[in-house]
Amino acid sequence: MLKREIIQAAYGLFLLVAGVSEVSAASIGVSPVRATLSADQQVGALTVHNTGTEPMSVQLEVMNWSQQDGKDVFTATREVLANPPIFTLPGGGSQLVRAGLRRAPDAQRELTYRIFLQELPPPPNPDFNGARMLMRVSLPVFVLPALAAEPVLRWKAARTSDGALKISLTNIGNAHIQIVNFSLSLPGSAQPWITQQSSAYVLQGQSRDWTLPANAENPPPPPGAILQLFAQTDAGDMEADVLITP
């Protein structure tokens, strides 16, 4: 379980904006920003905050979370339940939410889910014809396997036909990794050649690519060069040497 903090829906994950018939000052905060369950801890607790001044109703939905071709895939599940499924928060109010595991953890690999918190439309106000933003926030739920859970990363770099540089990451471990950012430097250089912001998750057994466009003022190194990669992740800082292939 990582650091506890509050995220605002306006800056958080999976923000959904929908137009209806009223202006709202409500927004959603959640603490902590993820839940980690296991055979020893089958229930996790989250606190949902209404950081605005207007009352708001929230509906919870848990989805199985997988990835395919670098994209998130969500499917319905009953393996994790969130309770209460629907609740109303006054302005400035909070609600304790519990996420409970309803199956045995996998013996070898981490299981991954997401809890979606959807703000529900309020009763219509016939006296106002403005717009309302409905917040939708998503946060991850990780279920640890019986074995030790650890991401194992393989980085690759290749020049593309248009001169860009494609950085590829494959996670061959049995647990996720979240890449917060990474930088690439030439050996002996005091300054990074480029820094890439990310915040991307790569689940176990999955891959992700980043394409860094060609820049005449700062062109990618040629094939055969070795880049020094430094990444900040939710598992700590990591370094790797990456060979650029044609």
Question: Language-model features: where?
Answer:
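Bacterial N-terminal signal peptides that target proteins for export
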Residues: M1-Y11
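Intrinsically disordered, low-complexity Pro/Gly/Ser/Thr-rich segments with frequent PxxP/GP/PP motifs
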Residues: D72-V73, T77-P105, Q191-P219
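Terminal connector regions
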Residues: R103-L144, A148, E217-P246
